[in-house]
Amino acid sequence: MSNVFQNTSTVTVLQGDYKVTTDPKVVFSTVLGSCIAACIYDEQVGVGGMNHFLLASSAGSGGVSARYGVHAMELLINGIMKKGALRSNLKAKVFGGAKMSANLSDIGANNADFVQRFLRDEGIPVISSSVGGTSARRVRFHACSGAAQQTHVADDRRLGEEERAAVARTQAAPARKPAAADNVTLF
């Protein structure tokens, strides 16, 4: 499986983003602390994607943003299915959810619990997961085959500081109203 990572182009998935591809030459990459990356794929069709969400849900009502778990998951699943995936073929790999700071509530554990519950409720099997702990991870995901690589990030103090700042901004930002282009068909 490691051969699928050779001779590929890397596409970075940032916080609050998701990417989907059918191109076997593309590998998605992200760095996670307390955030979660769900890697969902249909290896029979050769399509998959990765999201990267910051919080399981918004503190206020109406937080429609890919920064939040439910919306991020719906965007990813819908994006994969629009590229031809069959729902019955979907599989998932889940990463992240670390406790990055003693000063934060255990956002990572909440995120990990959310994504596991969401995938179970949607009937999408989690083939593998690496969640929790206290260190950041770098994840690479070959979406067409479902192959994934994870390495722990040695010096993750800066990532913890960045996550604290991102959480504070997210909690302080008013929820935006979705534009027509943001409408998603939920299933």
Curated annotation (Swiss-Prot):
One of its GO biological process terms is:
chemotaxis
SS bond list:
none
As recorded in UniProt, its EC number(s) are 3.5.1.44
What EC class does the entry list?
A: hydrolase
What reaction gets catalysed by this protein?
L-glutaminyl-[protein] + H2O = L-glutamyl-[protein] + NH4(+)
Entry's transmembrane regions: none
Q: Which GO terms describe its molecular function?
A: protein-glutamine glutaminase activity
What's the domain of life for this entry? Bacteria
Q: Which Pfam families match?
A: CheD
Which keywords has UniProt assigned to this entry? Chemotaxis, Hydrolase, Plasmid
The entry's family comment says: Belongs to the CheD family.
Function, in words: Probably deamidates glutamine residues to glutamate on methyl-accepting chemotaxis receptors (MCPs), playing an important role in chemotaxis.
* Protein name according to UniProt: Probable chemoreceptor glutamine deamidase CheD 1
